[in-house]
Amino acid sequence: MKIVLDTNVLVMALRSRRGASFRVLSELPTNDFQIVLTIPLYTEYQDVLSRSEVLELGYTQNDIKELTRYLASISHKQEIYYLWRPWLKDPKDDMVLEAAFASQSKYIVTYNSKDFVGKGIEESFGIKPLNAKDFLIEIGKLN
């Protein structure tokens, strides 16, 4: 099963090793799900995770580079041939949706689910937006 991780899930995983986001990353690699990456999404991961507010958590640029390279090494690389813009308010969210649609992902794991829910994504594309905790519950990894 393929999933797309919104960048905010990675930020939350770096902020706390006790939260559901860190648990999702800790499951990797797994036979239960595979993360999907596109070039724009990978670039956003690098950009956001390299910002001062993330680095101030005690990470170095090298740590971020290692994390993003690791994610790329275990991910399903997806090319985007058709842009669904504008479908959502935020073009960055459209980028996540495009990755999920093109890869036929079942889930978008995000903390901005309000930006995805009620927009016809689940009904039109069969893609369910969930936060990290609800995703882990959904796949039976958390009670």
At which residue positions do the language-model features occur?
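Acidic, PIN/NYN-like endoribonuclease modules and their adjacent C-terminal/linker elements
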Residues: 101-107, 113-143
